[in-house]
UniProtKB/Swiss-Prot annotation:
Its main location: cytoplasm. This is Serine--tRNA ligase. It catalyses: tRNA(Ser) + L-serine + ATP = L-seryl-tRNA(Ser) + AMP + diphosphate + H(+); tRNA(Sec) + L-serine + ATP = L-seryl-tRNA(Sec) + AMP + diphosphate + H(+). GO terms for molecular function: ATP binding; catalytic activity, acting on a protein; serine-tRNA ligase activity; transferase activity. GO terms for biological process: selenocysteine biosynthetic process; seryl-tRNA aminoacylation. It comes from Streptococcus mutans serotype c (strain ATCC 700610 / UA159). Homodimer. The tRNA molecule binds across the dimer.
Amino acid sequence: MLDIKRIRNDFDQIAEKLARRGVDEKTLHDLKELDFKRRQLLIKSEEAKAERNTASAAIAQAKRNQEDASEQIADMQKLSAEIKALDAQLVEIDGQLKTFTTTLPNIPADDVPLGADEDENVEMRRWGKPRQFDFDIKAHWDLGEDLDILDWERGSKVTGSRFLFYKGLGARLERAIYNFMLDEHAKEGYTEVIPPYMVNHDSMFGTGQYPKFKEDTFELADNDYVLIPTAEVPLTNYYRGEIIDGKELPIYFTAMSPSFRSEAGSAGRDTRGLIRLHQFHKVEMVKFAKPEDSYNELEKMTANAENILQKLELPYRVITLCTGDMGFSAAKTYDLEVWIPAQNTYREISSCSNTEDFQARRAQIRYRDEVDGKVKLLHTLNGSGLAVGRTVAAILENYQNADGSVTIPEVLRPYIGGVQVISPQS
């Protein structure tokens, strides 16, 4: 959520930056006018309340003097009616202001590239070289079916499209991957957390999913619970409404959880395979940091995600998202894209973002500065470390062999009982 004071005091710069994200300047002018109207009404309300207090004192004095106070009483009743009307207008305007400020995206950082969509993202670097195959390669969904480790047909029967069963060494591979990821993040100082897989609406508001992206979620009927779209939601809301001792910052959390997404607007996209599912596992990283440290923490978080891909020896690239492709809450985002041979392209496997104080303001997560003792909004960061299903897809395709088998990356073998190869026979 944006700071209305910042918009008020630095209107032109904020309008220019939000225009890069597709926000019409008229929207901000309407917001500014509404804010001005609110402040004028507030002044009138406070003045009327002061007059009412004066009238009340005059009535009390008149009664003590046994004098007629009917005129003062009439004045006070008139003032009370005026105050009631002013306060009703303030409540209405506050609601309109909240709608404005909670639906505006975050302000992009100064170094975020200007662009309309993903075609204008900027590649930063690449790691590893895509493998050259001397045989006809298979897509991961065909490999999974041929090896009898992934079953989409029965997933569709039991639930519906975009669901599947992992089985046998497929299930063990998935488990090996996320255990490896969690162990690697723990080495970097992250505290492992097992969060709730359902959260309330306040939590969804805190991280920016609600109200704007409500259609992308799965809500439970007849209660306030929502299935989490990412562990970012419960992890970030862990400190919602709290004041943290500044000496404790930065704080690192990591968690593996299922993620549930309706994929509204994705009809026809990635209908086969593990790239786009309604339910998938993801290892998440979340950080709470002081404002002056947050961009250094973003670089470190991105490096933590890269570390996983490097140890798995999966080729990838890092891109900086442009203004038109960033998520709603982000001020700056790096995407990691892993090489998927059957598609002959890189696909997103991690997204690491600094939201600055955008989520912290919505969730009221603050810290007490140990130097000046003041309570301030902190910065929150989040990143995938990594999407587990997409990692399975990348391993199956990059490590496939001519005989239809798949070699297990060396770093995962201790997590899967020493198994080196998944073959049709195994």
